[in-house]
């Protein structure tokens, strides 16, 4: 089999070898690519500064590590939502078809027995006729395959209509993902479809990378859906409803706070959303904890990429048998990975809060600083008056946005969030200098900044700060060319990173913070950004009261 050597890509070859850095290469073999999405459209690769895994798939459709058109990650979540929509309606169609078939068998059996009984009665065999009728009744009562009707009022014809709709919309989504210039048009069509699943569903997005992916997937549905994302925020006033570990991550603990006791306690299917499934261990840990507290029968795992091995898949099957549940998987690309070598990374080249990473290489330390505007913006969104405790034990009493997804939301909350995001976008658009702009989400706070960026006009890119340390190399095809590091504004004990932002690439850089933080904590981030923005840096702290600038 012919291999494609990174960065070249041949869409007809299912195996691709990525030579990431010296002494490290990864071979990716596609096993399922149902929409024929080019690998090069989904991700590039980079070396990772993490002892648990030495490389990273740098997503081009997620809006996390590198700048993207904000409509692309919104569309990615919606595309996964369509896969779920198709699956749920296919399941319903199977149930309805089986139910109809079972009813037909029962009716035929009853009719046959009645005819036999009538003939026997004419022949004077009344006793045998009674036996025949009893047998017919027994046949009519015997259940056919999959006859539990959990969706009353929905017909087989309606299911077929919904599946035809899903097929059409999936074509639109694939076009938008394959050709980013159509992402906005595709997402607008999908969002306007106002889809409804045949039964309620709860979505759970994994922090920090998949908080927006899960929210975008949930947002596709007009009614009957709920969403919550896990968090690494320590909120003293609240207790975590579920807790588990992400074993291969640089930050392993996941917490889950919900204000609505019924959000997790129902029996509806749960959709676990992550950008990438490597081993599936995090999913296993999640399901085990959920089943011990909020048991149910159906789980769906949705991801952009799925790299599980045969042994990993067997672990899912074993868990299904052990707990008496079903686990289904949905993804845009499925395959296997084979790693060769160990990177010999120089510690001095890694991004650090002491020296940024791109400073000397790009000359950003020698250019004039861009002016900084700090705004406290009244966004119209409800607040939750709880505090957070950082890794140093310090308390921030500024309230959180109630509808961010961290505390649970339902379909009925979408309209209010959309209106608030659009209102913020209009105000920020008025601050633009007119050229290219970048909107930065911060950590777990990804979806609302992404949604705001999408409504700020043409020429706006989006990405988020991240905890994930990536080794930068400025060479063609490599995933991360430049890196900057600084202590997080929310927790100075945690280092945050920014990737692939060149000096003067954007006239305006907008940083959106979910809540107020002390001004001195923002300064390390400003020391990085004011060397990158061409004209101005805008730091927007949402919910800070009447808008003002300093």
Where are these regions (language model features)?
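PRPP-associated nucleotide enzymes
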Residues: 1-550
